[in-house]
């Protein structure tokens, strides 16, 4: 039926053109009623003639796919975070560092949308994968949900062999207010702010729910342009618009850092004038060649920085000061406040850090205080308002006994922290488990603090290693679980056994050992057994491992309780070696590019194999490329490889290299 297929294709073109005009150019050409009529006709025709339905049809934006879980996906290149600037001095220092390497520089300044980073992959012009940022290296695939966002094109307007795009998913203020109103009427808990609502919406297993949330997306970065080299960030933004993406129009170009600083000051006053939340500005070196010259640190690009708006300050009252015992035994005083709305959410508590901080600020129970969110995230007390004191305020004293276990509290010389002396303190054990299961550690989804409290109270666990001995029949009766949740939890626990050495080291909660240090130690020693034998002297020789960390690591592994805990993990089958150590590193130190349409495997699988065997799956061809794996319809990357004299392998030739 050529007439039906032609009508379907015409409808798709009309709808996608309308999406581009509305979201890409901000120039709507159809009324809502006209748009809805076209979409409903398309849905009806595709339902009557399913043989013409395609994955990139705009009808797929209404949702309908229900996922069982979100599979993990490794990003083509790591999604690094940005260094932060909080004032003019920080921006001047950033400019000094840049100009030390490049003399003439132009900056482009973009709005920092308060949402969540989303990575998109297009192959042969079609959207094939979308993922969350995750830990920067591995995220969750949420393609079906992202297809429901009209600002994300399902097919590029210009053909491209491969295109990796990064941008920010967000919820407009209007959508957020409507959603919370609906939830309030339904008796459901409200979202604290649009960012949380967007994050929750993108992680819905039912894509129809995501479609109803009316999310937005602004694209800002391209990793693999196929139309030659893009010379500047502004050229990248223009290219993205040409390809059908929604690009935030509020960007400016400046040639002097003083102009950037002045613009930042202007935007502090205008930050609330937009239909979406912004929490700062992103300043980038505009020239792409200069970006490459400046390069990256381990955590962030040297050519970009995020200017964070000054924190909004609000007055409230300290109703009480309560002690919380952490996983390392530190007693942290927390101010319980009269709830107030600040920087996008209601705040009822704020950390006071330690007794020295309380004394320095002279915070007392009953005080009127100004609070803010440090970095717009963590609530803190800025200062007291002494003129509002009545004389009834009470001075806080640090307890001499742990409020959780009544063990003595000590303060070691040279430290600001007070600590519980008992390693069996229930609060320390509870917080240690919460840390162990956290996303950047063992990443056991569905095991939040409330469930952990239940497991402890029911006597089902005493430490994190006991999680691996949990059984279905013991979980189902618990209040917050049930059959399906118990199944999902046990699967998440089982999956965590394969997390590898670096997350496990971080999850152990060793004092001074953060996520980065966990990766360094895993790379250095390769197995938990070798790390357990490490001495202070050899640990101190490792770059980025100082004396305090070395001493802490050595002492941790000397404890009998540590050996007992690790043995329980071993018996449960938890992997205690670096993930890469299981396979020969035949591609170690090699940068490899995959391009074109493959027949035997999909491209992402080949890139994963390259990394598992020690190589780097690069997104562009350069002189440093070891070789290119080329499938059918390989485009500009193949041409560039031939131009540079870089070896080109077929899919079969690549397969022969594998052990």
Swiss-Prot record:
One of its GO terms (biological process) is DNA replication. CDD domains: BRCT_DNA_ligase_like, LIGANc. Transmembrane segments: none annotated. Residues 582-659 form the BRCT domain. It is an enzyme of class 6 (ligase). The active site is at residue 112. NAD(+) binds at residues 32-36, 81-82, 110, 133, 168, 284, 308. Coiled coil: none annotated. Keywords: DNA damage, DNA repair, DNA replication, Ligase, Magnesium, Manganese, Metal-binding, NAD, Zinc. It catalyses: NAD(+) + (deoxyribonucleotide)n-3'-hydroxyl + 5'-phospho-(deoxyribonucleotide)m = (deoxyribonucleotide)n+m + AMP + beta-nicotinamide D-nucleotide. The keyword Chaperone does not apply. GO terms for molecular function: DNA binding; DNA ligase (NAD+) activity; metal ion binding. Its EC number is 6.5.1.2. Zn(2+) binds at residues 402, 405, 420, 425. Gene3D superfamilies: 5' to 3' exonuclease, C-terminal subdomain, 6.20.10.30, BRCT domain, DNA ligase/mRNA capping enzyme, Helix hairpin bin, Nucleic acid-binding proteins. HAMAP family: DNA_ligase_A. NCBIfam families: dnlj, PRK07956.1. DNA ligase that catalyzes the formation of phosphodiester linkages between 5'-phosphoryl and 3'-hydroxyl groups in double-stranded DNA using NAD as a coenzyme and as the energy source for the reaction. It is essential for DNA replication and repair of damaged DNA. Belongs to the NAD-dependent DNA ligase family. LigA subfamily. This is DNA ligase. It comes from Desulfitobacterium hafniense (strain Y51).
